[in-house]
């Protein structure tokens, strides 16, 4: 029986799914901590061994980084993925490497209504341009345009555009980050590591002091997750200030993308962070920054805006792409 393999490689975790052609449910789906492996081939060995099959007709790998040709160096992980080497090692005749947000773009087609939280219904246009954007370990962006009876997905590295501060605090944040990185992209701020960078800026510039409990929580595990959790609990001012600043920059960035693409088919905010802070994004600062486009605020208000709440959208998109190759 023909099987197809889908893989969504992220800086924090990697999702793998193998399915039989013509069947609905996957044979096996697993999540692996990316940092536990030295490369993708080692992880695939473990996964296929557990799946109990070595017969894979097609595979699609969604990767966080620019994809050009058959070999990709990941942006937020010390891995290089070589499609031809994987094809030879695992006897997979058809392998596709795509950008992780290209996979998210494909995944939009198979989302269910309860996979979306609508922030702004707007005035959706059938076959209109769509944008997918999302912060996680990095900041991904892709466009979708209607071509030949369906949506074509266009990957980008839009998260690496220059950060443009909107007020004095953001300008001070820019100067702080320039001391560490030189060039400051939106990804330096709108990402998990970016939220931590905002916290460090606030702390180092005397704009807030963390409690001993927050310091301990950040040191014990995922620092960005700890900041988010403490901010949402409402009893840690520096975490709240950091998250509020984060969503303002996030909203402004998404608004910039809206002006560039005029996505009358909708803007879909995916990634690992948005669904976890949806209440904060609904509260006001995100939407105010999204709308704050001067003479074009009225236009921005007509564009549909959704949060994708299904964390597996990239895997769903990669699976759809792999199925099409059989």
Feature locations, PLM:
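Short, acidic Gly/Pro/Ser/Thr-rich loop/turn segments
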Residues: 14, 66-68, 138-142, 197, ...
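Active-site nucleophile and cofactor-binding loops and adjacent substrate-binding regions
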Residues: 32-34, 74-78, 96-102, 122-125, ...
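A short secondary-structure junction signal
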Residues: 108, 142-146, 201
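Short glycine-aspartate micro-motif
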Residues: 4-8, 56-60, 96, 130-134, ...
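Glycine-rich phosphate-binding loop of actin/hexokinase-like ATP-binding domains
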Residues: 115-187, 278-279, 285-291, 295-300
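Short, electropositive alpha-helical surface patch
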Residues: 112-121, 322-326
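Short beta-strand-loop/turn "lid" adjacent to the catalytic site in phosphate-handling enzymes
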Residues: 51-115, 132, 275-279
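ATP-binding/phosphotransfer module of carbohydrate and carboxylate kinases, centering on a glycine-rich
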Residues: 1-54, 172-326
């Amino acid at each position: 029986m023909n099987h197809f393999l889908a893989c969504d490689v992220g800086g924090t975790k990697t999702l793998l799914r193998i399915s039989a052609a013509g069947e609905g449910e996957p044979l096996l789906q697993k999540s692996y901590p990316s940092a536990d492996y030295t490369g993708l081939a080692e992880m695939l060995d473990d996964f296929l061994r557990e799946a109990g099959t070595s017969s894979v007709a097609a595979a699609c790998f969604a990767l966080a980084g620019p994809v050009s040709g058959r070999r990709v160096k990941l942006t937020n992980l010390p891995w290089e993925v070589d499609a031809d080497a994987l094809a030879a090692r695992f006897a997979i005749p058809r392998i596709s490497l795509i950008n992780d947000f290209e996979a998210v773009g494909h995944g939009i087609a198979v989302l269910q209504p309860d996979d979306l939280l609508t922030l702004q219904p707007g005035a959706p246009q059938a076959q209109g341009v769509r944008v997918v954007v999302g912060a996680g370990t990095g900041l991904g962006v892709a466009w979708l345009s209607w071509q030949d009876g369906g949506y074509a997905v266009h990957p980008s590295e839009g998260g690496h555009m220059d950060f443009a501060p909107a007020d004095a605090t953001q300008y001070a944040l820019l100067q702080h980050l320039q001391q560490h990185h030189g060039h400051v992209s939106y990804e330096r701020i709108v990402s998990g590591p970016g939220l931590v960078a905002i916290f460090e800026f606030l702390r180092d510039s005397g704009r807030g002091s963390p409690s001993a409990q927050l310091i301990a929580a950040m040191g014990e595990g995922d620092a960005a997750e700890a900041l988010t959790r403490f901010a949402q609990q409402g009893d840690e001012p520096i975490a709240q200030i950091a998250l509020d600043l984060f969503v303002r920059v996030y909203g402004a960035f998404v608004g910039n993308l809206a002006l560039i693409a005029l996505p009358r088919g909708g803007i879909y905010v995916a990634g690992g962070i948005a669904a976890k802070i949806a209440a904060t994004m609904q509260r006001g600062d995100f939407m105010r920054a999204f709308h704050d486009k001067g003479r074009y605020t009225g236009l921005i208000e007509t564009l549909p805006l959704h949060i994708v709440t299904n964390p597996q959208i990239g895997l769903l998109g990669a699976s759809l792409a792999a199925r099409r190759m059989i």
